[in-house]
């Protein structure tokens, strides 16, 4: 009898320890986010929401952000842009950079909140200050386009420089184009080429295409067909029609490479399919069907 009581008491202690351990685990916000991410990957969005809610209540910024994503996408909950904005705001207050950026997007487009360009700029600026490249690029784009603020190429250069420094490929390409044209900064072809090259390294196809053009024509560097071919080839691999067309043209004309009409035609075909009109035109001249 006494032995049975001891066993029962031991079981209660063990169960108590398990419960305590569970509570402790639930109180670890980062672990909660990890569990939420696991549930999300398994497409159990309802369970993911529960974990993210608990993490957010414990002021874990990524928990609030992920909760905002669920409401924005309508996963595990009814789609609610107002709630998405609310949770992005909480994440941003807790210095989660992408939360600031996406909140900026909502204010810029007026989704879930009243459209407010000044607030969009404020949140993009905070994202950029938190070293989120897309936040810097968004600011650069706004000042570059001049649709909702007075166009300011100097500020565009400032923010695209920050974006490029944070390895945003598109930001590097646009920065290169500003150096190329001398907008907001003195014209500097060497800096333009360096920016395009970095963009290409970051797998931005227009950056590869533009770098290829500069090497091909000797702008910002000594004319170098080998480097031009390499950039056009990478642009083509990244589905840039102009890159495929220019690569094909160099192969067809034997520039920097042994003439290879067969390979050139294949690249013209790919370029045409990707929307490069010049590639389509040359195929017509050669009487070759795409």
UniProtKB/Swiss-Prot annotation:
Family as reported in the entry's similarity comment: Belongs to the hcp beta-lactamase family.
Domain of life where this protein originates: Bacteria
The gene coding this protein: hcpC
Family annotation (SUPFAM superfamilies): HCP-like
Stated name of the protein: Putative beta-lactamase HcpC
Signal peptide range in chain numbering: 1-25
Reactions catalysed according to its record: a beta-lactam + H2O = a substituted beta-amino acid
Claim: Transferase is one of the keywords in the record: no
């Amino acid at each position: 009898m006494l032995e049975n009581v001891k066993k029962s008491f031991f079981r209660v202690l063990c169960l108590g320890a398990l419960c305590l351990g569970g509570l402790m685990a639930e109180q670890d916000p980062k672990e909660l986010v990890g569990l939420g991410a696991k549930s999300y990957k398994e497409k159990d969005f309802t369970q993911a929401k529960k974990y993210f809610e608990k993490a957010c209540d414990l002021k874990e910024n990524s928990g609030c952000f992920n909760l905002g994503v669920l409401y924005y996408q309508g996963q595990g909950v009814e789609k609610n842009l107002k709630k998405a904005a609310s949770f992005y705001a909480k994440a941003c207050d807790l210095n989660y950079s992408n939360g600031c950026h996406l909140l900026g997007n909502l204010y810029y487009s007026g989704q879930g909140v009243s459209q407010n360009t000044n607030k969009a700029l404020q949140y993009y600026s905070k994202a950029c200050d938190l070293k989120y490249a897309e936040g810097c690029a968004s600011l650069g784009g706004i000042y570059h386009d001049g649709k909702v603020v007075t166009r300011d190429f100097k500020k565009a250069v400032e923010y695209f420089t920050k974006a490029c420094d944070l390895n945003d490929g598109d930001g590097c390409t646009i920065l290169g184009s500003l150096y190329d044209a001398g907008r907001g900064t003195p014209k500097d072809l060497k800096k333009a080429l360096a920016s395009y090259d970095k963009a290409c390294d970051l797998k931005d196809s227009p950056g590869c295409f533009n770098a290829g053009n500069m090497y091909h024509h000797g702008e910002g560097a000594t004319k170098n067909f080998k480097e031009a071919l390499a950039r056009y080839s990478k642009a083509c691999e990244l589905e840039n029609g102009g890159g495929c067309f220019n690569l094909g043209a160099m192969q067809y004309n034997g520039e920097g490479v042994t003439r290879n009409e067969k390979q050139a035609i294949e690249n013209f075909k790919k370029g045409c399919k990707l929307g490069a009109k010049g590639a389509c035109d040359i195929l017509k001249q050669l009487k070759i069907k795409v």
